[in-house]
Every structure is written in structure tokens, then in C-alpha cells.
UniProtKB/Swiss-Prot annotation:
GO terms for biological process: isopentenyl diphosphate biosynthetic process, methylerythritol 4-phosphate pathway; terpenoid biosynthetic process. The gene is ispE. It catalyses: 4-CDP-2-C-methyl-D-erythritol + ATP = 4-CDP-2-C-methyl-D-erythritol 2-phosphate + ADP + H(+). Its EC number is 2.7.1.148. Catalyzes the phosphorylation of the position 2 hydroxy group of 4-diphosphocytidyl-2C-methyl-D-erythritol. This is 4-diphosphocytidyl-2-C-methyl-D-erythritol kinase. InterPro entries: GHMP_kinase_C_dom (IPR013750), GHMP_kinase_C_sf (IPR036554), GHMP_kinase_N_dom (IPR006204), IspE (IPR004424), Ribosomal_Su5_D2-typ_SF (IPR020568), Ribsml_uS5_D2-typ_fold_subgr (IPR014721). Coiled coil: none annotated. GO terms for molecular function: 4-(cytidine 5'-diphospho)-2-C-methyl-D-erythritol kinase activity; ATP binding.
């Protein structure tokens, strides 16, 4: 099925699902400036969509550029070129993006697009580098890319690259989207950011522990996020995902989530999606492999 953005002649159409950071602890800062963290990722059955077709001339053409993002620095283009370099292929690609996820939202839009590009073109180009190598390429593009390449809910450590698969409940989430772009660099550079949270064991986390250490910083610096949290907390325990700006609450069923969504003002866009331990992208690739 194609969207208005992706033409019917695209050879391969794949989802690029959103993710939530159900918690995020900052343990410290490394000498290179990166932060040691612990976080829990789960995917959503909602996201962007990408279409791909093979080119014989080696060119990478993204036909749906994003306003304000130069072609050469777009993560989709960078992922495609990194895969070309790593595999030695002479093939290129036409790529179309149906952008549904907000930028600067903390739900992984750009990282997910990059991972879908790596996996999609690895399939179309028959480069077959394997998940480990693709995750390695992805890490050079961004700390969140490997979790999308792996496609499994995970407890992440290090800078986010050390992944332990976990089995979580798959509740329904209401994700609200405050209309502000949150700078990840600003949040992680904030003097007031907690950077000394003690490490937590994954079993303790799954028993209900954890918080988001970035949330107090974002609430202080971005009143749009603070006000959205105050509003959503009237209905459900709400939390920031990643560095935001998106916030979320969980529900046992879709009806309950939809009821709250209908009570939010039009100035606070939102969507309802179910948590997934296996990403939509991997479900689609598994289905293709069976054909």
C-alpha cells in the first residue's frame, strides 16, 4: 500500500516505527563528552514509511527532502552512502519518505528512518551484511540507530549501544506532541542535569523502577512540555520520552487511551499506538523472507 508521498512504482515500502524511552538514567559523563546511560526501549506500531527503488548509476536520490535539513546531512542519505561504502556495491537508490513522526520529539524519527534505510537497501541491493554489521554502521550515524536495526525491545547501556533484549507487556500508549523542538545537545549539556544516578539492574527495572533524568531539565527550559505534562497527568501518570518533546502515558486498552486523547485540546496533538517488542520493520522483513 502506497501513501500520497511514496509512488506506486517503488520496489519496496517499509515502516520506520517510533520508539519510547520508558525510562532514562544518566550515570555519568565520559572523557569524550558522551554520557553513560541506562534506558529501556519499546517500539510503537506507528511511524514513518519509506519507499525504495534500485538505481543502476550509483546515485542516492531522496525525492522527499525535509525542510531545513540539507540533502548531504539527512540521516537517510548518510545511511545509504555508508552502506554503499561498507558493501562496495555500485548500485544506488531512489528513496521516498512519508514523514509522520515529529522532529525533535524523542521518539526516534530520524534514527528509525536511518535503520530502515540500512535494512531496506541491504535487502534490495542483496549486500547481506548481517544485523551486527548494520548495527555497527548505524552506531556511527547515531546512538539510537542500532536498537532500530536490531528491532527488539531492549535495555540499553553505555551510550545506548549495549543492548539486552527484554520481553515487556505491550500496553497502549497515548503520545502527546508539544509543539516545540527540544535540543538534545542543550539538554545533555545542561549544568543541572543529574549525572550520578546509580546503575540499576534490569530485573529491578522490569519490576517497576526507573525515571527520566532529563525530564526536570526539559520541564524547566521548555514550558510547553511542562504544561503538557501537567495536563496529561490529570488523566494518567505521564512521562517524557528521551529528551522530548513528546510525552506519554500507558493504558491497558485502546478505548481508554482514545478517551483521554479526545479530551486533550487541539493545541496539543497526540496519537494512540500499541507498544511492540518486535518492531513493525522486522515483522515486515520477516514476512518478505518467507515469500
Amino acid at each position: 500500500m502506497t501513501s500520497a508521498t511514496i509512488p506506486a512504482h517503488a520496489e519496496l515500502i517499509l515502516p520506520a516505527p517510533a520508539k519510547l524511552n520508558l525510562m532514562l538514567h544518566i550515570l555519568g559523563r565520559r572523557a569524550d563528552g558522551y554520557h553513560q546511560l541506562q534506558t529501556l526501549f519499546q517500539f510503537l506500531d506507528h511511524g514513518d514509511e519509506l519507499g525504495f527503488s534500485v538505481r543502476q548509476d550509483g546515485e542516492i536520490r531522496l525525492h522527499t527532502p525535509i525542510d531545513g535539513v540539507p540533502h548531504a546531512s539527512n540521516l537517510i542519505v548518510r545511511a545509504a552512502k555508508r552502506l554503499q561504502e561498507a558493501s562496495g556495491t555500485t548500485l544506488g537508490a531512489d528513496i521516498w519518505l512519508d514523514k509522520r513522526l515529529p522532529m525533535g520529539g524523542g521518539i526516534g524519527g530520524g534514527s528509525s528512518d536511518a535503520a530502515t534505510t540500512l535494512l531496506g537497501l541491504d535487502h534490495l541491493w542483496h549486500t547481506r551484511l548481517g544485523e551486527d554489521r548494520l548495527a555497527e554502521i548505524g552506531l556511527a550515524l547515531g546512538a539510537d540507530v542500532p536498537v532500530f536495526v536490531r528491532g527488539r525491545a531492549a535495555f540499553a547501556e553505555g551510550v545506548g549501544e549495549l543492548l539486552t533484549p527484554v520481553e515487556l507487556e505491550e500496553p497502549w500508549f497515548l503520545v502527546a506532541v508539544p509543539q516545540v523542538f527540544v535540543s538534545t545537545a542543550e539538554v545533555f549539556g545542561a549544568p543541572e542535569l543529574t549525572r550520578d544516578t546509580p546503575p540499576i539492574k534490569v530485573r529491578s527495572l522490569l519490576a517497576g523502577g526507573g525515571r527520566n533524568d532529563c525530564q526536570p531539565v526539559v520541564e524547566k527550559r521548555y514550558p510547553e512540555v511542562r504544561n503538557a505534562l501537567i495536563l496529561l497527568n490529570k488523566f494518567v501518570s505521564a512521562r517524557l520520552t528521551g529528551t522530548g518533546a513528546c510525552i506519554f502515558g500507558s493504558f491497558p486498552n485502546r478505548d481508554d487511551a482514545d478517551k483521554v486523547a479526545r479530551q486533550l485540546p487541539g493545541t496539543l496533538p497526540s496519537f494512540v499506538a500499541q507498544g511492540r517488542n518486535i518492531s513493525m520493520l522486522h515483522r515486515r522483513l520477516q514476512a518478505l523472507a518467507k515469500k
